[in-house]
Design a protein with these regions (language model features):
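Conserved, mostly hydrophobic/aromatic
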Residues: 35, 43, 59, 79, ...
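Canonical Radical SAM [4Fe-4S] cluster-binding loop centered on the CxxxCxxC motif
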Residues: 15-61
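Aromatic/hydrophobic pocket-lining residues that form the small-molecule binding cavity
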Residues: 59, 92, 122, 161, ...
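Conserved strand-turn element in the central/C-terminal portion of the radical SAM core barrel
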Residues: 116, 140, 144-148, 168-192, ...
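Auxiliary Fe-S-binding modules of radical SAM enzymes
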Residues: 1-23, 201-203, 207-307
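Conserved SAM/AdoMet-binding glycine-rich loop
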Residues: 67-170
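Structural preference for beta-strand elements that scaffold enzyme active sites
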Residues: 28, 76-78, 108-110, 136-138, ...
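Catalytic cores of alpha/beta
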Residues: 122-126, 184-202
Length: 307
């Protein structure tokens, strides 16, 4: 959807700067700006954006601007920025209602969310949001290892991650969890893999989406690598970590490597595709030792920034 052509108001359409790859065809609607937490040591995406809730009038103006161009073709909407479900439930219900009125063919509305926010939302509020048309929540798990969650300043415990996931599923949401390969570095990759699998098994989310940790300038872990206090995981370690993660999964989730940061595509429906997924990783680990071109390709991934 080429909504970049929107130029209907002097102030301009306010686009969310980031969205999941799976929302590449969605209309983007900015409800909040920035990240209300903004302390994770691996992330610098919102460091320069103060958190604020956008006025409802501005949001409704943006919906009207988009409706004028894309009323009938809009099938999905992504709500940004990083945790818009923390606004008042009645306000988000109003926004969802207006979206459905403006775009009669909407099939899906999704949003980023924090586990802590989901934990704090009363179950009846989550059900109201679901009934109003919010269908999927994208949530960063990153890791299920308690020590790592603390060291990266995620702001949630493994138990809170589990509580949030179960609560969201009980309210009827599709639940998409993000795992950050390599976040344990060379020192803690096994604990990361096992702990993450344990949390995922207790939630059984609809989607597990993996990304590979890439140090971002301006983040705490980038500085730690430069200072020599964090040893970045090698290509081989990250492949072995993903292998251990998948081996320990006992879920019915769709597993997706739908991000440019990942070294190789490992995708499938669990549990039926587990053996094929592990075979892909076995082949990559074998090739890594013998194929200079593959090693160079992996190294180019390491130079990516802000993905």
């Amino acid at each position: 959807m080429a909504i970049g052509r929107l130029r209907l108001k002097p102030r301009g359409y306010d686009f969310p700067p980031y969205r999941p790859p799976s929302e590449s065809s969605s209309l983007l609607l900015r409800v909040t700006r920035g990240c209300p937490w903004n302390r994770c040591t691996f992330c610098s995406l919102y460091k320069s954006i103060p958190f604020e809730r956008r006025p409802l009038e501005e949001i409704f103006e943006d919906i009207e601007a988009a409706r004028a161009l894309y009323r009938d073709e809009t099938r999905s909407v992504f709500i940004g920025d990083s945790n818009s479900i923390l606004i008042k439930t009645e306000d988000l219900v109003r926004i969802l209602t207006v979206l459905h009125q403006a775009f009669p063919n909407i099939e899906r509305i999704t949003s980023y969310a924090r586990a802590k926010t989901i934990c704090k939302k009363p179950p009846e509020d989550l059900r109201r949001l679901r009934e109003a048309g919010l269908t999927r929540l994208h949530v960063g798990l990153e890791t299920g290892d308690a020590e790592l969650l603390g060291s990266i300043h995620k702001g949630s415990t493994p138990e809170e991650m589990v509580t949030a996931g179960r609560k969201a599923k009980e309210a009827g949401f599709e639940y998409s969890l993000y795992v950050l390969l390599g976040i344990g570095g060379e020192e803690r990759w096994e604990q990361h893999a096992r702990g993450t699998a344990a949390v995922l098994n207790r939630i059984d989310p609809h989607f597990i989406r993996v990304r590979t940790f890439i140090p971002q300038p301006g983040s705490g872990l980038y500085d730690a690598i430069k200072a020599g206090t964090f040893k970045k995981a090698s290509h081989e370690t990250i492949l072995k970590e993903q292998q251990m993660l998948i081996e320990n999964l006992d879920v019915t989730s769709t597993y997706l490597s739908d991000h440019l940061s990942n070294y190789i595509p490992v995708n499938g429906k669990l549990p039926e595709d587990k053996h094929c997924m592990l075979d892909v990783l076995d082949e990559a680990l074998t090739a890594l030792h013998d194929d200079e071109t593959l090693r160079e390709r992996f190294s180019r991934k390491d130079s990516l920034r802000n993905l």
